[in-house]
Amino acid sequence: MANFIFSAFADEIDSNFEEQLKALKELNIGLIELRGVNGKSFIELSDEEVNAVKEQLDSYGIGISALGTPIGKITVDGDFEAHKKLLTRIMDIGDVLGCKVLRMFSFYPAEGMADDTFKSVVFDYIQQLLEMASARVFIL
């Protein structure tokens, strides 16, 4: 018989992080794909709040399967440099929380952009993100 590892977004259970962890524990789910914490995205947390999240996770014995990031959730004509800075912050948080796996999105095309141009830009953007992530041993 196969063994399965369950992980869940818990911010759809409750916006309160403590309640999320309680529910996961009750359901015997040992991993969370972290996204929302106390009504905001984990990427909006201060360093102190990130440390508190780590303490709560540890106290419940719950690990993180992946960080549910918004990386790639912009149009290709958006501010990619700001997006790269966001990736850096996300990796800083991942280091504190002990999670090296980042969920990401595909990029959205710019209005009127030709398919070949879109494909080329997306491949370039993903290559840049991969270089950043691999330098810090993160998986996109």
Model-predicted regions and their roles:
Residues A10, F42-I43, F80, K119:
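A generic secondary-structure micro-motif detector
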Residues K40-I43, K73-D77:
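Short active-site-adjacent helix-start/loop capping segments
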Residues F17-V37, I93, L97-G98:
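Catalytic domains of carbohydrate-active enzymes, especially glycoside hydrolases
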Residues M1-N16:
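Boundary/entry segment of secreted carbohydrate-active catalytic domains
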Residues N16-E19, Q56-S59, V76-L140:
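Active-site acidic/histidine proton-transfer and metal-coordination neighborhood
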Residues N3-S7, L31-E33, G61-G68, C99-R103, ...:
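Structural preference for beta-strand elements that scaffold enzyme active sites
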Residues F9-I13, R35-V37, L67-G72, F107-P109, ...:
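Active-site beta-loop-alpha junctions enriched in small/polar residues
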Residues E33-D58, S106-A114:
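Glycine-rich, proline-tolerant flexible connector loops at the mouths of alpha/beta enzymes
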